[in-house]
Design a protein with these regions (language model features):
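Conserved SAM/SAH-binding loop
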Residues: 104-111
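Proline-centered flexible-loop/turn and helix-kink motifs
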Residues: 96-97, 171
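Glycine-rich phosphate-binding loop and adjoining beta1-alpha1-beta2 segment
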Residues: 53-95
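Glycine-rich phosphate/adenylate-binding loop
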Residues: 2-7, 26-33, 113-299
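Extreme N-terminal leader/targeting segments of oxidoreductases
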Residues: 1-25
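Glycine-rich adenosine-cofactor-binding loop
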Residues: 23-65
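Hydrophobic/aromatic anchor residues within beta-strands of the central parallel beta-sheet
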Residues: 100-102
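A short helix->loop->beta-strand "cap" motif at the edges of active sites that frequently abuts
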Residues: 54, 98, 141-143
Length: 299
């Protein structure tokens, strides 16, 4: 937990009315590790800052592009600059009571000390392989972790898919990211290979576009919905105001009338990350590049 100066309860009056002062103190002493600071996680970071979170670790190797501005509220002069440094500056300017650490790196290269120090991990990275890596770290250090994801797909001018998913991992209680197995085997395989080996696999297995890594469509409306759900789950974890939902989804083209639907998910007794067999096999459950390639070939 982060050390903070005395709280200005007036600033947090509206949330204290239902959370209480004790919960606000918990929020203001909590450290959250944000892996990825794109359209979704940047929103989660700002919302947490609004609510007075104690400390944010912002982790991302990338720079802002002009194409980010359709879903992220950033000034034009931020384009071309590091995401973490500019977001850190923005939060510190408007929320000086929040401590912000900006780290320009990938999740895979982040020092273990940061994973250990964080109270909660929010995994908003672009690649499946980095999400698997973060999942293993959450398991090793017994940290609650959230995995928000949004996807839009259209075909021949018709919207086919407009949905978001939020998974919450609570150590020892809920299924982990890899229990779900809901990731594209070809995408995982492509991410695990350098361009030369990717072409070798393409020829060996007679693959076409399956090993291409596409640029996905994205819009602020969908990111904000999933980000809002993530912040609420984070508040549940911090304050115990309600039980976290292990897996929920938003379907923007469904006629069910529900904003977020719960999805039943059970622990996989043979999960390569969190199963008892895996934990007994090794003290370190981090996947190697060869492990990722094998996962991609199997699924």
């Amino acid at each position: 937990m982060a050390n903070v100066s005395p709280l200005n309860f007036d600033r947090f009056d509206r949330q204290i009315r239902f959370l209480g002062k004790r919960a606000q103190k918990l929020i203001s002493t909590t450290k959250v590790l944000m892996l990825g600071t794109g359209g979704g996680n940047s929103q989660v970071s700002i919302q947490l800052a609004c609510m007075g979170i104690g400390e944010l670790f912002l982790v991302d190797p990338d720079r802002w592009a002009e194409t980010d501005r359709n879903r992220v509220f950033i000034p034009r002069e931020f384009v071309g600059k590091r995401k973490v440094s500019t977001l850190k500056k923005l939060i510190e300017e408007y929320f000086p009571d929040v401590r912000v650490d900006g780290i320009v790196t990938k999740a895979e290269y982040l020092p273990d000390e940061i994973y250990k120090e964080a109270d909660i991990i929010v995994v908003g990275t672009d690649t499946i392989s980095s999400r698997i890596y973060a999942n293993r770290k959450a398991i090793i250090y017994r940290k609650p972790a959230l995995f928000p994801y949004a996807s839009i797909y259209s075909e021949k001018g018709k919207l086919r898919q407009f949905f978001g998913v939020l998974q919450v991992y609570i150590p020892g209680k809920t299924p982990c990211f890899e229990c779900w197995k809901n990731f594209d085997k070809y995408r995982l395989l492509a991410e695990s290979l350098d361009p030369k080996r990717r072409e070798e696999f393409r020829q060996r297995y007679n693959l076409g576009d399956e090993l291409n890594i596409p640029v996905e469509a994205s819009v602020s409306a969908l990111n904000y919905i999933i980000a809002g759900a993530a912040v609420w789950e984070i508040l549940k974890i911090i304050t115990s105001i309600d039980k976290p939902i292990p897996l929920q989804a938003y379907n923007g083209i469904s006629r069910s009338g529900r904003l977020m639907e719960r999805i039943n998910l059970k622990k996989d007794p043979n999960c390569p990350a969190c199963s008892l067999a895996r934990r007994l096999k090794s003290n370190s459950s981090l996947p190697s590049r060869e492990d990722l390639i094998k996962l991609g070939e199997k699924r």
